[in-house]
Amino acid sequence: MDFRRSIPADATGIAALEEEIFSDAWSYRDIQDLICTEGGMCFTAIDGGEVIAYVIGRLIAPEGEIYRVAVAPHKRQRGIGYRLLDYAVKTSKGQGLERLFLEVRSRNIPARKLYTAYGFKEIGTRKNYYKDPQDDAIVMLRAHSMDMQF
């Protein structure tokens, strides 16, 4: 398994996982645009030529925001999400990342556990933020100012 910055060719595999995992899947074009845009914070895990996980976000130093973290269902519970997130954060630190935000569905317990294990702290709630199904968004932050090591 290899981790890398996403390349345009990864957009097809990322879009396929989006469709499989998310009810509000991003389009192939949206994914490719973010991969190719300056400030795009996009990373992919590849196993046997297959996209098995990705992190998509944006970096406008010193802040970054993660929009998506996804792992193929048949590859979960193996630490891939944690390791890819770690790779993304460490790589982005070299571009001036100091604070990293994300939002997660309140009912997405596995994702919340991953983010907490990686050092994110809950800093707020956005009531009824998500639709289909309706859910609150938990806003999380990981920052140097919280004495966390990137």
What are these regions (language model features)?
Residues 50, 72-86, 93-95, 99-100, ...:
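Conserved glycine-rich acetyl-CoA-binding loop
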Residues 43, 49, 70, 118, ...:
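Non-heme di-metal
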